[in-house]
């Protein structure tokens, strides 16, 4: 893809949305990988009085895998967008990112952490917007 093509509004927003998802989900996912014990301890306390108290470990594992995969796909998708002008990988990254945010939102609601759930809404809007723009044909 040429620089002129990349700077066209649709292509540029596709690239930037995918880059945002890559940064957000890779950083968060890798934090969970490198501080798994700390995250598990915090989440165990967070969900202690919720219906999810017995499944914190599988939730953390599935959330970490989904989050890290979303970030990796978004990162690879951003590079693929810039080099080849195709956005299939970025679109899959956005799909997984959206799924991950919905998973987190459900967990926060079940833990009755309504402020925590509300703080996820802007991330959902970013993910949904990325899905929409990545689904658009390149100009």
PLM features: residue spans?
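Solvent-exposed, well-ordered loop and adjacent helix/strand elements within mature globular domains
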Residues: 23-64
């Amino acid at each position: 893809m040429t620089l002129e093509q990349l700077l066209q509004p649709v292509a540029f927003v596709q690239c930037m949305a995918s880059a945002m998802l890559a940064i957000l989900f890779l950083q968060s996912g890798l934090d969970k990988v490198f501080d798994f014990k700390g995250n598990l301890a915090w989440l165990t306390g967070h969900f202690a009085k919720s219906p999810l108290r017995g499944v914190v470990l599988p939730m953390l594992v599935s959330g970490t895998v989904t989050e890290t995969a979303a970030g990796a796909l978004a990162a690879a998708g951003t590079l693929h967008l810039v080099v080849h002008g195709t956005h299939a990988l970025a679109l899959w990254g956005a799909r997984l990112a959206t799924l991950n945010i919905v998973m987190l939102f459900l967990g926060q609601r079940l833990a009755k952490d309504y402020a925590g759930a509300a703080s996820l809404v802007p991330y959902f809007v970013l993910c949904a917007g990325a899905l929409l723009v990545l689904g658009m044909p390149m100009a």
